[in-house]
């Protein structure tokens, strides 16, 4: 397989910057239990990010990562949540992430409009980034990415004409949440 073909299947390119590395560390720690720095280094290497133990230790310190006991009683790394909640918490399970997205959609979603593969969501002032974070963490396969301002989110559908179906889905979630 050529280098170009390998890159096609490798997923999105990850820049080798400190900020990108920090973002990837937070993503990993929020998605799965990580018990050691060596395990985290392996997971980063799997994503094409090679780091030394000293760099990883410094990164974890800069991210205010701590070890906490998860629901199974294991000590795992955790980072403070983004937004107002600064206390590190055990990562939410998939159903909890989806439920959080449903609940926040019901509370915050004012409207959803689509065009081609784009969806524009409106929220009350100051709430767009909060809802975008919940949508990102729910990891819906149909969503390629989100961009949030103060009261507006832009969602990008993976499908070229998937915007309307995605808008309808989010509106249904907001209306059907109990």
UniProtKB/Swiss-Prot annotation:
The keyword Membrane does not apply. Keywords: Amino-acid biosynthesis, Arginine biosynthesis, Cytoplasm, DNA-binding, Repressor, Transcription, Transcription regulation. GO terms for biological process: L-arginine biosynthetic process; protein complex oligomerization; regulation of arginine biosynthetic process. Residues 1-21 are annotated as: Disordered. GO terms for cellular component: cytoplasm. The keyword Protein transport does not apply. InterPro entries: Arg_repress, Arg_repress_C, Arg_repress_C_sf, Arg_repress_DNA-bd, WH-like_DNA-bd_sf, WH_DNA-bd_sf. Its main location: cytoplasm. One of its GO terms (molecular function) is DNA-binding transcription factor activity. Pfam families: Arg_repressor, Arg_repressor_C. It comes from the Bacteria. It is found in: Cytoplasm. Pathway: Amino-acid biosynthesis; L-arginine biosynthesis [regulation]. Regulates arginine biosynthesis genes. NCBIfam families: argR_whole, PRK03341.1. This is Arginine repressor. It comes from Streptomyces avermitilis (strain ATCC 31267 / DSM 46492 / JCM 5070 / NBRC 14893 / NCIMB 12804 / NRRL 8165 / MA-4680).
């Amino acid at each position: 397989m050529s280098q170009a073909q390998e890159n096609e299947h490798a997923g999105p390119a990850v820049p080798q910057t400190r900020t990108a590395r920090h973002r990837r560390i937070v993503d990993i720690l929020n998605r799965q239990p990580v018990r050691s720095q060596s395990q985290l280094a392996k997971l980063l290497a799997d994503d094409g990010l090679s780091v030394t133990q000293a760099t990883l230790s410094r990164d974890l310190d800069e991210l205010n990562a701590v070890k906490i006991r998860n629901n199974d009683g294991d000590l795992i790394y955790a980072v403070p949540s983004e937004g107002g909640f600064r206390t590190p918490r055990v990562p939410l399970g998939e159903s909890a992430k989806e439920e959080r997205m449903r609940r926040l959609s019901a509370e915050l979603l004012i409207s959803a409009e689509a065009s081609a593969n784009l969806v524009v969501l409106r929220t009350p002032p100051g709430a767009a980034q909060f809802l975008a974070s919940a949508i990102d963490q729910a990891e819906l396969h149909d969503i390629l990415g989100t961009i949030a301002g103060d009261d507006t989110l832009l969602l990008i559908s993976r499908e070229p004409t998937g915007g309307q179906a995605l808008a309808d889905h989010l509106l249904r979630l907001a209306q059907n949440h109990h």
